């Protein structure tokens, strides 16, 4: 029975799923906008939003937790120096998920995932 099982399996083993979600979160935090399938985007929200919440309180313990979850020093620096202060006044809801049509090859529903408060210069350039 499937009672109280929170996460989507996404047809992957647990280690593959964890690695994929970590890579998606790192890409999102690095580029601030990515395109992926809709189920992956919805699951990514559960991984990326707590990371941004960690970045709002710059302590050594939070930096170590963020590094444990991302395994990327550049992302941790950006998270605490840039994204944490940017979202300091927002209580959750850091991501925007927009439906982006269907993929050409297999007709999978696609989604555009972006950070809500992106700088205007970057948003206009892309």
UniProtKB/Swiss-Prot annotation:
A Pfam family annotated for this UniProt entry: Ribosomal_L17
Keyword Ribonucleoprotein: yes
Keywords of this entry: Ribonucleoprotein, Ribosomal protein
GO MF, any single term: structural constituent of ribosome
CC annotations in GO: cytosolic large ribosomal subunit
Bilayer-spanning residue ranges: none
GO biological process, one term: translation
Subunit structure: Part of the 50S ribosomal subunit. Contacts protein L32.
HAMAP family in UniProt: Ribosomal_bL17
Family affiliation: Belongs to the bacterial ribosomal protein bL17 family.
Name the UniProt record assigns to this protein: Large ribosomal subunit protein bL17
